[in-house]
């Protein structure tokens, strides 16, 4: 019983080897087990001989086992060696074989029990323990070979144990009867013999259990139909005496029905779930009631182990897949199975399922589930219920069906996922294509805009010059600047008066919805100072909402040129207001939008500039709360009401109509905000970020927010939004749509960049007011558009309102935004016309841009020099401070920005115009940021330019 063999052989040798054994092996097994059991049986009769022969037999066994260990293949030889050893000993050898078998069985039993109970039995067999099943199997095979050869020669051959010397191999055959008799006697005595194997007293219990543990090989002769021993045959007659020493529930009957006895232990075993034997084990041992104690001990032990294993299986079954192999009747169980083919059958049965399930990993969940029920039924209930083989198979079929269903479902899911991925990829490709198209369109637009801008600038310059000539009063300050000042001054007047007359020209320019491009070119065409001055103001406004103003520029283009110039200056103030409101809105968050609406409405009354300052005060307070546009978005709504309240309160100052509008807008927005919130992540977020787009420069989020929001809106609408934006751009003659669309796409791209670049862009805008003014000039291109844009900006300085323009973009926002925009436009236009504060704001904006615009601010200020003075005085300092801080602050956080805004606003609060200037500065910075961002975004993405 060399240790080396057993561990490997244990799992297989008793159960698998025997089943796998060739007929000769089976014969040997049957012989060996008959010899083994016979030996056990004979042991009682032949204990004396066993004692005498046991020394020899054990020596032989050990030698045989060693040989077997060295050469499992030599098992046949070993069996022959046993036979030879028996042969030389004659019948004594046979008896010795029996003794050996008893000893070996004892050794095996002990070894098996040792394997199970190494603690209890740690003897010579401990070494053999790991091997014991295998050596047992091998020895059994060897002895079986000998015994079965004996049986083949004569099943009774060993029967003549009394004639140790006389019995020859040939004699063994005649002694089958004696053997059978002894077996019959020994059937009861097997346990006795096992118990009698007191030499291995350790294993008395072991011996019975171990022998029983060793599945008896199926009787080859019975399989052939030859076995004369009948029920007494030591070897398993599959249907008949399978039950082991203790007959199972109904000894032969359950098994034969389950599997034909010839089918062998496995079919039979499945028939009797091993649990069944437990019942019988506990029940009086089979007819050969060996000392009931031993049988009972076996039964109890067996039952305990079964229970343990059942509980283990229960515990492990969730993991059953992993532990299945250990859980399924393991080697230990097999040893039990050796006794109870039932166990073996379970092994065969469960392993089949196990194998199948292993092949079908997806079936596992079901399989484990099934197996769990299966085990409970078989193992736990088997104490009471005996499964017929059919049930497991039904379960198995069900399991297979479930597995198939599961597999199908998983395949379907996989297919769906693949389809989704494909769709995503397609969408992405389409988006990319659209972006490319948009870029191309943008390029075309920009080209057209440049051309138109050049034309418009020329026309505007001429017009502005004419207007300036006509408006010498306005031109007086601008005149020193000559073209530019006139244009700037003209712009304020234009805002007032030219808006009507030049609107026609703007209408012409309107044809150039890409007036933005013109405005950029106008930016380029600094020579076109007039438009440039406007543009700068607008730039603050438009740059605040570069995309808005760009959109508005196209819109404003639709407005008459002079009107556009006016609207530009207005739009700057609006933008300032809208930026303020948008800032507030950004601060307030999605509601801020409503605020931006309301604030823009209240700004729409002339006092609105003051109101924005008031709001600015209020706003700065809310903004900190709203500190981050994004963070504010949620909290913002509450602050929004305060601001709304402030707005409302200020609104009365400017005009209750504004308040009414505000109320309407608020209502719309209030209605909408839910919608926005519905869009909420994108909607309110984008709303605030859009309004935040003005705030973009303001808050870190600023561009990032606007880009986020625009990205959100575009991403939230995702493809649809993108297409909406793109088409919205197309849809809204206002390129603002396109700029909007660009903004989302650009914003998306710019999000990461925007945060970093916000400050940079602000700086760039400050540095490149000319560059921004072009965009802002685009915004100026549509002064009214910019006003509208301003309203949109307020609504969603960023895309949202633009989206509203493009009703497609954010429909939720759109409805509110459009209504708000319309209201705001109307409000703004009148209030804008009324307001010259916009110039002051523009002056403020210009201060924001830098002192560069201060000149224009001064000129622009001419309409409202007071504001410009206050604003410029404060604004230049504050803007200068803010410009740098704002860009950093915008980088650092909208809160900080808003706080400086508050401080500045508070400082400027003394002068509402100062506040307006600070707000306008902020807005200008924001607008500039926006314009720069938009420009950068357009250049980078060139997506938005959808013509």
UniProtKB/Swiss-Prot annotation:
Q: Keywords of this protein's UniProt record, alphabetized?
A: Acetylation, Coiled coil, Isopeptide bond, Metal-binding, Nucleus, Phosphoprotein, Ubl conjugation, Zinc, Zinc-finger
- List every position bearing Phosphothreonine: 104
Q: Which residues carry this modification: Phosphoserine?
A: 6, 32, 44, 57, 63, 70, 74, 79, 91, 105, 113, 168, 482, 527, 529, 531, 837, 846, 862, 887, 890
Q: Which residues form a coiled coil?
A: 915-944
Q: Where is this protein localized, as stated in its record?
A: Nucleus
Q: Which GO terms describe its biological process?
A: RNA destabilization
Map the zinc fingers (C3H1-type) to residue ranges. Answer: 214-240
Q: Which GO terms describe its cellular component?
A: nucleus; protein-containing complex; ribonucleoprotein complex
Q: Does the keyword 4Fe-4S apply?
A: no
Signal sequence span is none
On subunit structure and binding partners, the annotation says: Interacts with ZFC3H1 in a RNase-insensitive manner.
PANTHER family, alphabetized = ZINC FINGER CCCH DOMAIN-CONTAINING PROTEIN 18
Its name, as the record gives it, is Zinc finger CCCH domain-containing protein 18
Question: From which organism does this entry originate?
Answer: Rattus norvegicus
């Amino acid at each position: 019983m060399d240790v080396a063999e057993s561990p490997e052989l244990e799992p297989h040798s008793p159960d698998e080897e025997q089943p796998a054994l060739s007929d000769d092996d089976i014969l040997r097994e049957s012989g060996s087990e008959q010899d083994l059991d016979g030996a056990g049986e004979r042991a009682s009769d032949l204990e004396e001989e066993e004692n005498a022969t046991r020394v020899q037999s054990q020596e032989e066994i050990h030698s045989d086992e060693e040989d077997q260990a060295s050469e499992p293949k030599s098992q046949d030889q070993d069996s022959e060696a046993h036979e030879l050893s028996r042969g030389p000993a004659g019948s004594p050898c046979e008896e010795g074989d029996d003794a050996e078998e008893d000893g070996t069985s004892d050794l095996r039993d002990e070894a098996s029990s040792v394997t199970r109970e190494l603690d209890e039995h740690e003897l010579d067999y401990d070494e053999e323990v790991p091997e014991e099943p295998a050596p047992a199997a091998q020895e059994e095979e060897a002895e079986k070979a000998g015994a079965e050869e004996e049986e083949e020669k004569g099943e009774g051959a060993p029967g003549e144990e009394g004639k140790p010397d006389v019995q020859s191999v040939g004699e063994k055959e005649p002694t089958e009867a004696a053997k059978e008799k002894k077996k019959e006697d020994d059937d009861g005595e097997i346990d006795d013999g096992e118990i009698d194997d007191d030499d291995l007293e350790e294993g008395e219990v072991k011996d019975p259990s171990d022998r029983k543990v060793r599945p008896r090989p199926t009787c080859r002769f019975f399989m052939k139909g030859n076995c004369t021993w009948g029920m007494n045959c030591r070897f398993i007659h599959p249907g008949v005496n399978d039950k082991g020493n203790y007959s199972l529930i109904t000894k032969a009957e359950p098994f034969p029905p389950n599997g034909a006895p010839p089918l062998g232990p496995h079919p039979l075993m499945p028939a009797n779930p091993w649990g069944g034997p437990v019942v019988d084990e506990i029940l009086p041992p089979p007819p050969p009631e060996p000392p009931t104690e031993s049988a009972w001990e076996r039964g109890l032990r067996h039952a305990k182990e079964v229970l343990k294993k059942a509980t283990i299986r229960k515990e492990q079954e969730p993991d059953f897949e992993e532990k299945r192999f250990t859980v399924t009747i393991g080697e230990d169980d097999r040893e039990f199975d050796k006794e109870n083919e039932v166990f073996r059958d379970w092994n065969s049965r469960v392993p089949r399922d196990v194998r199948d399930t292993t092949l079908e990993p997806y079936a596992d969940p079901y399989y484990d589930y099934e197996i769990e029920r299966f085990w409970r039924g078989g193992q736990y209930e088997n104490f009471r219920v005996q499964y017929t083989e059919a049930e497991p198979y039904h379960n198995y079929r069900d399991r297979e069906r479930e597995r198939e269903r599961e597999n199908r479902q998983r395949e379907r899911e996989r297919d769906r996922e693949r389809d989704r991925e494909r769709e995503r990829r397609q969408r992405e490709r389409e988006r990319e294509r659209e972006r490319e198209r948009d870029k191309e369109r943008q390029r075309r637009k920009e080209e057209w805009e440049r051309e138109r801008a050049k034309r418009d600038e020329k026309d505007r310059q001429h017009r502005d010059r004419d207007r300036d000539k006509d408006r010498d009063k306005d031109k007086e300050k601008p005149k020193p600047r000559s073209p530019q000042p006139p244009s700037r001054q003209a712009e304020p007047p234009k805002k007032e008066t030219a808006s009507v007359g030049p609107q026609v020209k703007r209408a012409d320019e309107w044809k150039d919805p890409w007036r933005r491009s013109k405005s950029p070119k106008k930016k380029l065409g600094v020579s076109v100072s007039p438009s440039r001055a406007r543009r700068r103001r607008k730039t603050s406004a438009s740059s605040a909402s570069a995309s808005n103003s760009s959109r508005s520029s196209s819109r404003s283009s639709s407005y008459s040129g002079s009107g556009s110039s006016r609207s530009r200056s207005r739009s700057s103030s609006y933008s300032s207001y809208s930026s303020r409101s948008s800032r507030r809105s950004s601060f307030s968050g999605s509601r801020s939008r409503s605020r931006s609406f309301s604030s823009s409405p209240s700004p729409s009354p002339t006092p609105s500039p003051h109101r924005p300052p008031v709001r600015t005060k209020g706003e700065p307070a809310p903004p900190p709360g709203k500190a981050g546009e994004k963070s504010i978005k949620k909290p913002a709504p509450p602050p929004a009401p305060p601001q709304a309240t402030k707005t409302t309160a200020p609104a009365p100052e400017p005009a209750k109509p504004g308040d009414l509008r505000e109320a309407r807008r608020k209502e719309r927005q209030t209605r909408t905000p839910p919608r926005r919130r519905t869009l909420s992540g994108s909607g309110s977020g984008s709303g605030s970020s859009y309004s935040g787009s003005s705030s973009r420069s303001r808050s870190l989020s600023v561009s990032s927010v606007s880009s986020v929001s625009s990205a959100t809106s575009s991403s939230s609408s995702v493809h649809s939004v993108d297409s909406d934006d793109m088409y919205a751009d197309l849809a809204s003659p206002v390129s603002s749509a396109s700029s909007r669309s660009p903004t989302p796409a650009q914003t998306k791209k710019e999000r990461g960049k925007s945060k970093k670049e916000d400050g940079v862009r602000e700086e760039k805008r400050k540095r490149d007011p000319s560059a921004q003014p072009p965009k802002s000039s685009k915004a100026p291109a549509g002064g009214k558009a910019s006003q509208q844009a301003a309203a949109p900006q307020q609504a969603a300085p960023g895309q949202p309102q633009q989206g509203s323009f493009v009703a497609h973009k954010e429909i939720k926002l759109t409805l509110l935004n459009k209504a708000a925009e319309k209201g705001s436009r109307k409000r703004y236009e009148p209030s804008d016309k009324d307001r010259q504060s916009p110039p002051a704001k523009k002056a403020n904006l210009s201060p924001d841009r830098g002192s560069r615009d201060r000149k224009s601010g001064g000129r622009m200020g001419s309409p409202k020099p007071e504001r410009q003075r206050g604003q410029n005085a404060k604004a230049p300092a504050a803007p200068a401070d803010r410009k740098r801080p704002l860009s950093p602050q915008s980088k650092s956080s909208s809160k900080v920005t808003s706080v400086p805004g508050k401080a500045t606003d508070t400082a400027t609060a003394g002068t509402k115009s100062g506040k307006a200037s600070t707000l306008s500065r902020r807005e200008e910075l924001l607008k500039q940021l926006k314009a720069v961002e938009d420009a950068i975004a357009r250049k980078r993405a060139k997506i938005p330019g959808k013509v």
